[in-house]
């Protein structure tokens, strides 16, 4: 399995959000977490990405225990989180924002080739490549955040509210 979560408990300020969560994600799988607001989807992704330390339980990634490792260590292992908010660099161009996604050496070496692939999937980004990120529409900013995440070359991509602000044609 690429990811194993076992007996995970997590929450905020003593308030539990996740209770005894257990599941596996095989390599190559596409998994969707569906549920009402406030039921732990973001909390789970934050635990996996190293942004929130679980109260108890275990997270394994590529067969290695990674529970509680810091976010920078998780990124270096190939775990990429695209949060609900844009988290873009507003005063940088679209292409420079995309370049920031390819900060690991292996991704950086293939940036020119991979950015063309992103432009093929999200052609609006190519049209706007020299524009500052702050000038983009909400949907374009979401496309940019997703494109930047894809350029990281991570082994697993965690998208929080992936279709938020996107036009239906882009989602399909």
Positions of PLM-derived features:
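Conserved ABC transporter NBD signature motif
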Residues: 57-65, 77, 110-115
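Helix-to-loop junction immediately C-terminal to a conserved catalytic motif
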Residues: 49
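Short coil-to-helix segment of the ABC ATPase nucleotide-binding domain corresponding to the Q-loop/switch region
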Residues: 91-99, 129, 159, 169
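The feature captures the beta-strand-to-loop junction immediately N-terminal to the Walker
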Residues: 34-36
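A short, proline-enriched helix->beta-strand linker immediately N-terminal to the Walker B motif
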Residues: 150-155, 161
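Conserved ABC ATPase signature
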Residues: 132-136, 140
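ABC-type ATPase nucleotide-binding domains, specifically the catalytic core motifs of the NBD
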Residues: 13, 31, 69, 94-113, ...
């Amino acid at each position: 399995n690429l990811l194993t979560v076992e007996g995970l408990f997590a929450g905020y300020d003593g308030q539990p959000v996740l209770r005894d969560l257990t599941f596996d994600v095989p390599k190559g799988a596409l998994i969707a977490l569906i549920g009402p607001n406030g039921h732990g989807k973001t909390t789970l992704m934050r635990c996996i990405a190293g942004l929130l330390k679980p109260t108890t339980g275990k997270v394994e990634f590529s067969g290695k225990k990674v529970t509680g490792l810091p976010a920078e260590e998780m990124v270096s292992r190939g775990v990429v989180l695209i949060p609900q908010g844009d988290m873009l660099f507003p005063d940088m161009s679209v292409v420079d924002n995309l370049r920031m996604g390819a900060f690991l050496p292996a991704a950086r070496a293939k940036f020119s080739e991979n950015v063309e692939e992103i432009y093929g999937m999200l052609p609006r980004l190519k049209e706007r490549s020299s524009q500052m990120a702050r000038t983009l529409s909400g949907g374009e900013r979401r496309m940019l955040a997703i494109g930047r995440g894809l350029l990281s070359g991570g082994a697993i991509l965690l998208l929080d509210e992936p279709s938020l602000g996107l036009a239906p044609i882009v989602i399909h």
